[in-house]
């Protein structure tokens, strides 16, 4: 077994909340390859499509190889950004990742191109073994409205059905869905779960929308209040049996708002990192620490010399440090060490009333 195949650290299997582990960066590498997208989601964080296109069109296969070889602790690679299945070299990149020894070769996708079974098979044969399909409603009316793409739901479901059919040949395949929870779909959690039952999905990940990109620009219309999301998810989970509860997970919501939920269904967004050209980070780097700096462990300039571009190494925590805030009262919360804070835009709009520090658990005698 090579070094990349070591067990992931910082996970619990005892029914408690998953822990984040010690690393500020994590062991999941996101490789951004999708310079275009065939959906047009109303809440998309990548709202500057022209800049994304220019940035990723300049990225070469050799650049991608260097990204996947720089950090020896990376044991999971996820191809993402835009719609990666539209990239002509995606299968080649997956073969490259497999040959480099990554035990998990993953894909974050809208699932539409997986509706073509020969293409889905090609990716699986290239080494793909973890697929995260973004699907945001129980039917075409809701999903297609949010993606602003007619027929997107039908194709995404067909893609999931193809993956289900191929699992006999590729038994290591794990399939998850990603449902971006917002004000327009928060009321359809159970309907979505029931609609997905025939597709043999391993886990349904419900990510609360970030008030960033298009979501931030149309926040009053799209952003569901955290308290309403927590209440809706609590009602949803209460109606599931044990097997159903084991398949659902709510992410990207402050811990203090979800104390009524069972611990195993709430957690954190897994730490990961990616590379992008120096100076092209899309978040406000001056919005975080008082001195405007972001810790060097989270944002390392000139980490890779590409063939024509020099790349920075950017951890998910850099975005959090720039976009999220805490108040002094947070230091008294039992979740302070785990919590990344609340989006600045959210508290500027609605204040701090929802966020009540949780008393740390009393020590066991």
Give residue ranges: language-model regions:
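Flexible mid-to-C-terminal extensions adjoining Fe-S/redox cofactors in radical SAM and related proteins
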Residues: 2-25, 278-365
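Canonical Radical SAM [4Fe-4S] cluster-binding loop centered on the CxxxCxxC motif
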Residues: 21-60
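Cysteine-centered iron-sulfur cluster-binding motifs in ferredoxin-type domains/subunits
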Residues: 33-40, 83, 325-330, 336-337
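Secreted/processed peptides and extracellular or luminal domains of membrane proteins
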Residues: 43, 47-50, 262, 336-339, ...
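Short, solvent-exposed loop/turn segments at secondary-structure boundaries
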Residues: 54-57, 144-147, 220
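Radical SAM/AdoMet-radical enzyme domain recognition
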Residues: 61-79, 87-209
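Short Fe-S-cluster ligation motifs
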Residues: 66-85, 303, 355-365
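Radical SAM enzyme [4Fe-4S]-AdoMet core and its adjacent flexible, acidic
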Residues: 141, 149-157, 161, 165-309
């Amino acid at each position: 077994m090579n070094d990349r195949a070591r067990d992931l650290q910082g996970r619990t299997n005892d029914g408690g909340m998953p822990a984040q582990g010690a690393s500020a960066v994590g062991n999941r590498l996101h490789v951004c390859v999708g310079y275009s997208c065939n959906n047009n989601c109303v809440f998309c964080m990548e709202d500057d499509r022209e800049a994304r296109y220019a940035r990723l069109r300049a990225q070469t296969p050799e650049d991608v190889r260097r990204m996947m070889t720089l950090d020896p602790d990376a044991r999971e690679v996820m191809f993402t950004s835009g719609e990666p299945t539209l990239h002509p070299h995606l299968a080649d990149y997956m073969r490259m990742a497999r040959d480099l020894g990554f035990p998990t070769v993953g894909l974050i996708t809208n699932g539409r191109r997986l509706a073509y079974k020969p293409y889905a098979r090609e990716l699986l044969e290239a080494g793909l073994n973890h697929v995260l399909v973004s699907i945001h409603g129980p039917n075409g009316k809701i999903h297609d409205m949010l993606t602003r793409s007619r027929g997107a739901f039908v194709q995404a479901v067909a893609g999931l059905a193809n993956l289900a059919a191929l699992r006999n040949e590729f038994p290591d395949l794990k399939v998850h869905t990603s449902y971006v929870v917002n004000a327009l779909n928060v009321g359809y959690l159970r309907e979505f779960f029931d609609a997905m039952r025939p597709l043999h999905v391993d886990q349904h990940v419900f990510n609360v929308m970030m008030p960033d990109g298009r979501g931030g620009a149309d926040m009053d219309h799209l952003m569901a209040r955290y308290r309403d999301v927590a209440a809706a998810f609590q009602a949803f989970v209460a109606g599931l049996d044990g097997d159903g509860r084991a398949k659902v997970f709510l992410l990207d919501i402050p811990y203090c708002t979800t104390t009524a939920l069972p611990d195993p269904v709430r957690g954190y967004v897994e730490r990961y990192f990616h590379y992008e050209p120096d100076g092209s980070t899309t978040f406000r780097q001056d919005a975080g620490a008082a001195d405007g700096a972001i810790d060097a462990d989270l944002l390392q300039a000139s980490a890779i010399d590409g063939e024509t571009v020099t790349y920075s190494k950017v951890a998910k925590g850099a975005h959090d440090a720039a976009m999220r805030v805490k108040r002094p009262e947070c230091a008294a919360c039992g979740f302070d060490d785990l919590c990344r804070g609340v989006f600045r835009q959210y508290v500027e709009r609605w204040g701090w009333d929802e966020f009540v520090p949780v008393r740390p658990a009393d020590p066991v005698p």
